[in-house]
């Protein structure tokens, strides 16, 4: 055999690594560099491989590794072929990539093969498959464009430390509203991040490291989850906390910022991976893209509105948008918007060109790459010089392109760009250059897009086979076709005939080796088929003949079929193995029994499978027997010893060791049931299993030290490993097999069952899969110490139906797979056959029923993530590559794309599963626990590299109906919100999901991986729709090549199987999982917790397996609701809108008390918030946060407070009226990128006090748009009242302020965004905003000892939602009463310049008035600039309970205490906290502004917002601390008493009264205990109001306007 390996490279590879010279290493590197299968590796990786790889040659029929072998290396096949995991591997190909854990499958060398063996890295070594993270050596160079359009080139040296702190993608996208954690404002000159300070386009990691360290070290002991979590939860939390976040560096930006001369081949490859999906590069060849990437310059525009190109300006570059949006204003008035991936600028010519129109940025932080005119022209025109056109009869039939894959010159050649279908078929047998090594695979996958029938290719191949020089090439093509796409042949009679004819040609030409490989491939890839036959009577002939039987060691095979018979017409053919007949298993049945069954039935439903390989082995054995030639004896007569070529792992039956008449396991290729056993004899292609240990050979090692058999309250028995080999087997002594350390996993006792007695005592028995019931009885009798022979006992299964019916059955002696068969509602009992006692009492039956009823909170989050990932991965890996093509090109294939559709549906199913679980739980505390549970599951899915389920869970948590449950979310511990935020950050949609893609291609992301499937579909769809299928009448094969590459990358993610035993724990390899022998999950395996033993402890094994069974049963019986309207109704039922409050709130309070968290009662210092209410008719709306008025709620240092932002409100006309409207939903929490994120993009989470900004008016939205107020700071945002003219409307938002007489006091102006209906995309469950009208209400308050009572005024209760500025807690005990008495307004008017406790006025937007959140946020009093740590990207927040745990005595607030008393009432720690200081100011117009700034950098604050017009921001230096005597609050007691006199709503007030007397004040509720703890920020006077008032008010009707 001529070796394809370069002799020099082979000689160098044969040397031991320490003996290799630099010349040897360079020779090996050059050879590896030229291999296409290694083209994705960078130079440093190939250098490492050159030092570690070695050359090896293996003979045929040799076992390379077994399923139990620990993975320590991987292979590159250079010649020959191997069979692994049911697939034939042909050169050049790599296989066996796995890091740790057992192989999980066998690998057989089919013919003499050469391979390169690459050792896995040790713990202290760098992995070859991990990309290098070198210190940055080159200078960064990019251009900045300021607001005026002036360009500045930034060239600097970057410190290594600053670069190593960058997480994965890091551009701050304008659409992701506030991705950063908050820090105090730092000027650009003081910024610690060189990238942010230099470029001005913040990389989302600017402050990531600081917040990680600051928050991570904070004491979490005061968080409320402590009393809730169990010990297991705490240990699991520790594991979660120790988990390394999936953060990486922004490699793409690093490459972009390099000088063109500094860009390496690795940099260009990195840019190519990113750029090839942008529309601007569509229909360009790969060589053109490569050249463009090598010369592109990076540009950043920091501000929106910056002019990039003026009208009439000379053009000198071609621009491609990487991030942001630009607007081109043409001279004719036409406006054109361009988005990410679009291009503008010059055309490929050297002529002078001028800009027509003005190009300006629409958002902050726009990023571009630009290519100079000279380079652009040169590259695009150079393509013509590199192309070669093939003409026939004057027509172009093929276009080649000369391509260089790198600058080394070693990888260059011609590649087909486009051609006619005939020429593409012809090219199959032509020589393929090094730059196009996958042409055959690409063609066989994509031919279906331009050929009507595969037979067109088959006919040509049969013709070429007759030519001797082409025979080997044709055979390789057919082998690849069968191995990669066997579904093209199954079910297609024409292609089946082609395959039969090709086999006959191989036989005629004596190409037995190739024929054997073809048979193996067919057997490994074949799937079960259904054939239905009808016989006229039992005596009718079968029309086909049989062979085989278990007595021969084979299954039942079809030996011949009568031509033209019904059997032939039904698809039955020679070589088919019959797997089942009418549901009866035929895999291990005698020949006579099989014939009897077939003859005695007139209706035959056959399940068959093509297994020509084993069928020929059967014929060979039969011929040997007839000729009298002795054959190698079958090894033992154990079913478990029959090994065959199979494509799906499964179980192998094993009969009893004591069985006198032993049944022999058939040589089958059964799919899905039998374990893969491809062990072949060296001298003959037999299917005999090498087994090394003799009878009981391992039994002596099965002591307590090995399996952990220490008795724990229950007795324990271990089944001995049955002997399986006869010592007379001569073939076991052959060198090939005697060196193997092979054992059948089904023989390993790694499962545990629990057996009960009548008196309910139990013992644990460690068994294997094939242990029989009789053997279990024997050991159970021994363990229980029973007298009498084991024959007098039997094993019974007792089960209880949900209705309580007890079922009992005796199990047959040979019954096996006992651990897998037992259900949750069943038990195994040891029964005395001589007695008739009741095994399971009614009480025990009820206990069984209870145990079988599962709830989400009973399940282990690790186990749920494991089984979820296992289930999804099984679906994912079963997707045929052709299904992607059929789905993409909308082809009607015979096989269909059922697997693809099922996997596509997973995201929606799992998303609605999350919502169903949360919303079907009535108890609020349990709802919080379920949310916490799902966050843990998502974290574990991340470790399993199951991004699909992780995304689905995040999407479910952000559904509108879930996100609005404010009271539930506020109970969630802060650290889980941070965990959720970290998960959501992975799916940041900036730069085409760059962060997620960076993680996916990072060093730890080795298979198995379940990718985010919507992104996979999007990428393929872009490649399809962004490139023409035909160019100039020729098939665009460059497009097909790119699609094939994408599909190969997806399929490569399934190249290793998931091993549930290696994910998080050392548990049973087979128990509790559908496929036990699976490969390790690299990077996802937890170190075992100390309390879990790595030894096989019987009780622990049983508990783990029981949990796995519970999870499987739970997942299989899920009843998922998919109606979002029902979700909304359930959500409102648990946390209703305030418009639905009843007259008496005592029932609600009593219900809340049952849910009360065990957290200690809050003191007076732990205040909650007064919430303004904004009604909305629809269920999903976008809202703005309210400033927290009294945020001193000590829940722990890292507990992020619910955010409320006091917004200036706009007074509406008095003629507008709303009454009796029910508002079903509240506000949406913070908005991220509605423009570009996918519909379910989890850009932010539903968190307390966060709102969603309407994208239509959020162009200028920056960190100043929102603020988050620390729960530890004393912050008040109060405004006095003043008149504002309608002329003071905002220019951008066109909002109007109605004129109000000066006597009304302060008027806060609010602008409302109008762009809600403009959203082109929104997440699941989003609805459009329809702002309703409501009158402004006067509000004053009185608080009783029992709770904050109805002296509060409620606007018509809208479901304002979690964290919205209109929100109100359902458990805040705030009753609201309208104050119709104009005198109370008059009274308040006298305090126009006096400090008031709360916001003064509140209004709602009308349908006709725009609603601009960005401006209204900027007008917020006391607002600190800071991005929101938690964002909601799909749903509205709820008008739910603000703080459910706030119970107990609540003091009334009156105004009789002194300012000193007020300050004394503060908690000492909060009052004296030096971090935050409150600034109080009085302006000329009577507006009082309280701003909070911080003297040091903090993780929650970034910078204060710009001071709005009409407001005066006061710096700390200008202010003296202490009370301000000029700020005297009004005496509220008078207003309170007057408010009780009348119950008219404001709607009854005359217009003049309202227009002149509109003042609103909503005080915060304060939960108090002893009076000394009362917190009264900025209230100079405090007093008491009698409890009688509160009790009397409690039964009054809540009035809503």
UniProtKB/Swiss-Prot annotation:
Residues 530-615 form the PDZ domain. SMART domains: cNMP, PDZ, RA, RasGEF, RasGEFN. It is found in: Cytoplasm; Cell membrane. Residues 749-835 form the Ras-associating domain. GO terms for biological process: microvillus assembly; positive regulation of GTPase activity; protein localization to plasma membrane; Ras protein signal transduction; regulation of GTPase activity. Residues 1-22, 179-250, 1192-1274, 1302-1324, 1455-1478, 1571-1601 are annotated as: Disordered. Gene3D superfamilies: 2.30.42.10, Jelly Rolls (2.60.120.10), Ras guanine-nucleotide exchange factors catalytic domain (1.10.840.10), Son of sevenless (SoS) protein Chain: S domain 1 (1.20.870.10). GO terms for cellular component: apical plasma membrane; centrosome; cytosol; endocytic vesicle; plasma membrane. Residues 412-526 form the N-terminal Ras-GEF domain. The modification Phosphoserine is found at residue 3. The gene is RAPGEF6. Keywords: Acetylation, Cell membrane, Cytoplasm, Guanine-nucleotide releasing factor, Membrane, Phosphoprotein. Residues 187-205, 1229-1238, 1255-1274 have a biased composition (Low complexity). The modification N-acetylmethionine is found at residue 1. A nucleoside 3',5'-cyclic phosphate binds at residues 280-399. This is Rap guanine nucleotide exchange factor 6.
């Amino acid at each position: 055999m001529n070796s394809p390996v370069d002799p020099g490279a082979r000689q160098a590879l044969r040397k031991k690594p320490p003996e290799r010279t630099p010349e040897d290493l360079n020779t090996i590197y050059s050879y590896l560099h030229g291999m296409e299968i290694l083209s994705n590796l960078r130079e440093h990786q190939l250098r490492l491989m050159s030092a570690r790889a070695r050359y090896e040659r293996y003979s045929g029929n040799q076992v390379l590794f077994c399923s139990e072998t620990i993975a320590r290396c991987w292979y590159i096949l250079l010649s020959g072929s191997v069979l692994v995991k049911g697939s034939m591997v042909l050169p050049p190909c790599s296989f066996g990539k796995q890091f740790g854990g057992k192989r999980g499958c066998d690998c057989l060398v089919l013919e003499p093969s050469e391979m390169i063996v690459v050792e896995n890295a040790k713990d202290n070594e760098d992995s070859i498959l991990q990309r290098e993270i070198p210190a940055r050596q080159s200078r960064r160079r990019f251009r900045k464009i300021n607001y005026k359009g002036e360009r500045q080139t930034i060239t600097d040296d970057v410190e290594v430390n600053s670069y190593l702190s960058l997480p994965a993608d890091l551009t701050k996208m304008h659409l992701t509203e506030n991705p950063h954690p908050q820090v105090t404002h730092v000027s650009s000159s003081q910024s610690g991040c060189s990238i942010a300070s230099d470029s001005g386009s913040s990389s989302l990691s600017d402050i990531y490291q600081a917040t990680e360290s600051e928050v991570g070290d904070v004491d979490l002991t005061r968080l409320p989850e402590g009393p809730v979590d169990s010990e297991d939860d705490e240990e699991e939390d520790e594991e979660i906390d120790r988990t390394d976040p999936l953060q990486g560096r922004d490699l793409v930006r690093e490459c972009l910022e390099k000088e063109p001369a500094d860009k390496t081949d690795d940099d260009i490859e990195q840019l190519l991976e990113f750029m090839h999906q942008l529309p601007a590069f569509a229909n360009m060849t790969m060589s053109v893209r490569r050249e463009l990437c090598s010369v592109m310059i990076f540009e950043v525009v920091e501000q929106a509105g910056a002019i990039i190109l003026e009208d009439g300006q000379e053009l000198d570059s071609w621009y491609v948008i990487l991030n942001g949006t630009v607007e081109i204003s043409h001279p004719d008035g036409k406006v054109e918007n361009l988005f990410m991936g679009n291009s503008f600028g010059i055309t490929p010519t050297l002529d002078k060109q001028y800009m027509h129109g003005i190009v300006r940025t629409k958002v902050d932080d726009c990023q571009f790459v630009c290519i100079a005119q000279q380079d652009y022209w040169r590259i695009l025109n150079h393509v013509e010089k590199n192309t070669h056109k093939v003409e026939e009869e004057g027509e172009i039939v093929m276009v080649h392109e000369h391509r260089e894959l790198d600058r080394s010159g070693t990888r260059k050649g011609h590649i087909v760009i486009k051609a006619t279908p005939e020429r593409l078929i012809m090219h199959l047998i032509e020589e393929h250059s090094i730059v196009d090594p996958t042409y055959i695979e690409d063609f066989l996958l994509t031919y279906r897009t331009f050929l009507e029938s595969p037979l067109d290719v088959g006919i040509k191949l049969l013709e070429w086979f007759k030519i001797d020089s082409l025979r080997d090439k044709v055979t390789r093509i057919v082998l690849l076709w069968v191995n990669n796409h066997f579904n093209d042949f199954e079910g297609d009679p024409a292609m089946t005939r082609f395959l039969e004819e090709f086999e006959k040609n191989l036989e005629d030409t004596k190409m037995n080796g190739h024929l054997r490989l073809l048979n193996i491939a067919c057997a490994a890839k074949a799937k079960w088929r259904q054939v239905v036959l009808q016989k006229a009577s039992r005596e009718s002939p079968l029309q086909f003949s049989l062979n085989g039987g278990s007595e021969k060691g084979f299954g039942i095979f079809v030996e011949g079929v009568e031509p033209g018979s019904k059997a032939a017409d039904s698809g039955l053919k020679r070589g088919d193995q019959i797997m089942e007949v009418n549901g009866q298993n035929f895999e291990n049945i005698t020949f006579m029994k099989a014939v009897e069954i077939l003859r005695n039935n007139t209706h035959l439903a056959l399940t068959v499978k093509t297994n020509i390989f084993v069928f020929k082995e059967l014929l060979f054995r039969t011929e040997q027997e007839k000729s009298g030639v002795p054959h190698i004896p079958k090894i033992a007569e154990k079913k478990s010893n029959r090994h065959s070529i199979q494509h799906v792992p499964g179980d192998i039956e094993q009969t009893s060791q004591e069985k006198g008449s032993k049944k022999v396991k058939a040589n089958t290729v059964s799919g899905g049931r039998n374990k893969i056993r491809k062990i072949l004899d060296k001298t003959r292609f037999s299917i005999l299993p090498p087994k090394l240990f003799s009878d009981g050979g391992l039994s002596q090692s099965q002591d307590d030290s090995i399996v952990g058999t220490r008795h724990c309250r229950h007795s324990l028995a271990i089944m001995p490993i049955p002997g399986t080999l006869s010592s007379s087997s001569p073939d076991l002594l052959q060198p090939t097999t005697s060196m193997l350390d092979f054992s059948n996993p089904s023989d390993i006792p790694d499962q545990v069952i629990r057996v009960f007695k009548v008196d309910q005592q139990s013992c644990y028995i460690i068994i294997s899969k094939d242990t029989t019931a009789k053997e279990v009885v024997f050991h159970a009798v021994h363990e229980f110490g029973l007298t009498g022979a084991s024959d007098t006992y039997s094993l019974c299964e007792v089960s209880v139906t949900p209705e309580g019916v007890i079922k009992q059955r005796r199990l047959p002696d040979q019954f096996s797979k006992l651990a897998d068969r037992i259900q949750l509602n069943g038990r195994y009992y040891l029964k005395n056959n001589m007695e008739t006692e009741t095994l399971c009492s009614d009480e025990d039956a009820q206990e069984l029923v209870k145990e079988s009823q599962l709830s989400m909170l009973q399940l282990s989050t690790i186990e749920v993530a494991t089984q979820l990932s296992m289930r999804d991965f099984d679906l994912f890996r079963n997707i045929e590559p052709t299904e992607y093509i059929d789905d993409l090109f909308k082809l009607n294939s015979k096989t269909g794309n059922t697997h693809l559709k099922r996997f596509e549906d997973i995201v929606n199913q799992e998303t609605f599963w999350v919502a169903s679980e949360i919303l079907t739980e009535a108890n609020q505390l349990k709802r919080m626990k379920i949310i916490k549970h799902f966050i843990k599951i998502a974290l574990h899915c991340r470790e399993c590299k199951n991004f699909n389920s992780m995304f689905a869970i995040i999407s479910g948590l952000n559904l509108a109906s879930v996100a609005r449950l404010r009271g539930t979310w506020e109970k969630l511990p802060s650290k889980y919100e941070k965990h959720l935020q970290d998960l959501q950050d992975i799916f940041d949609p900036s730069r085409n999901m760059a962060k997620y893609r960076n993680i996916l291609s990072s060093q730890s992301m080795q298979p198995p991986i379940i990718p985010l499937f919507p992104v996979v579909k999007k990428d393929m769809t872009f490649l399809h729709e962004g490139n023409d299928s035909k160019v100039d009448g020729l098939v665009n094969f460059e497009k097909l090549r790119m699609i094939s590459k994408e599909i190969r990358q997806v399929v490569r993610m399934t190249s290793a199987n998931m091993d549930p035993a290696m994910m998080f724990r050392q548990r049973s390899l087979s128990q509790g999982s559908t496929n036990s022998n699976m490969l390790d999950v690299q990077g996802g395996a937890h170190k075992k917790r100390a309390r879990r033993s790595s030894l096989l402890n019987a009780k622990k094994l049983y508990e783990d397996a029981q949990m796995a069974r519970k999870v499987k049963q739970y997942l299989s019986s899920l009843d998922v609701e998919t109606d979002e309207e029902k979700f909304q109704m359930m959500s409102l039922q648990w946390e209703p809108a305030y418009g639905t409050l009843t007259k008496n709130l005592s029932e609600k309070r009593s219900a809340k008390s049952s849910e009360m968290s065990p957290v200690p009662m809050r003191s007076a210092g732990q205040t909650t918030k007064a919430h303004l209410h904004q009604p909305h008719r629809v269920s999903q709306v976008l809202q703005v946060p309210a400033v927290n008025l009294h945020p001193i709620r000590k829940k722990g240092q890292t507990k992020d407070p619910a955010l409320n932002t006091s917004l200036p409100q706009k007074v509406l006309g008095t003629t507008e009226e709303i009454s009796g409207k029910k508002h079903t939903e509240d506000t949406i929490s913070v908005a991220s990128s509605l423009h570009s994120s996918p519909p379910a993009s989890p850009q932010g989470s539903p968190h307390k006090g966060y709102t969603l900004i309407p994208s239509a008016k959020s162009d200028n939205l920056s960190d100043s748009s929102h603020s988050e107020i620390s729960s530890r700071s004393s912050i008040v945002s109060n405004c006095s009242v003043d008149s504002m003219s309608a002329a003071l409307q905002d220019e951008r938002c066109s909002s109007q302020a109605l004129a109000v007489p000066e006597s009304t006091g302060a008027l806060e102006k609010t602008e409302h965004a109008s762009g809600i209906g403009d959203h082109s995309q929104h997440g699941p469950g989003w609805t459009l905003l329809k702002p309703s009208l409501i009158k402004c209400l006067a509000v004053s308050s009185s608080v009783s000892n029992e709770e904050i009572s109805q002296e509060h005024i409620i606007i018509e209760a809208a479901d304002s939602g979690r964290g919205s500025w209109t929100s109100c807690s359902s458990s805040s005990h705030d009753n609201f009463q309208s104050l119709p008495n104009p005198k109370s307004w008059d009274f308040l008017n006298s305090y126009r310049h006096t400090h008031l406790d709360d916001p003064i006025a509140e209004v709602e937007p009308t349908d006709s008035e725009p609603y601009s959140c960005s401006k209204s946020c900027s007008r917020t009093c006391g607002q600190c600039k800071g991005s929101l740590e938690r964002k909601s990207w799909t749903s509205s927040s709820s008008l739910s309970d603000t703080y459910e745990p706030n119970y107990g005595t609540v003091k009334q607030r009156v105004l009789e205490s002194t300012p000193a008393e007020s300050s004394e009432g503060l908690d000492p720690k909060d009052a004296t906290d030096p971090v935050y200081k409150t600034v109080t100011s009085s302006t000329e117009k009577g507006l009082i502004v309280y701003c909070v700034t911080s003297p040091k950098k903090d993780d929650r604050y970034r910078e204060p917002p710009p001071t709005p017009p009409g407001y005066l921001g006061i710096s700390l230096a200008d202010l003296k601390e202490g009370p301000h005597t000029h700020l005297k609050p009004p005496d509220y007691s008078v207003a309170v008493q007057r408010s009780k006199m009348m119950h008219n709503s404001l709607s009854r007030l005359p217009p003049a009264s309202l227009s002149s007397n509109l003042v609103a004040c909503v005080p915060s509720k304060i939960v108090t205990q002893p009076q000394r703890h009362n917190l009264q920020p900025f209230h100079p006077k405090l007093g008491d109001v009698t409890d009688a008032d509160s009790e009397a008010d409690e039964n009054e009707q809540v009035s809503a306007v």
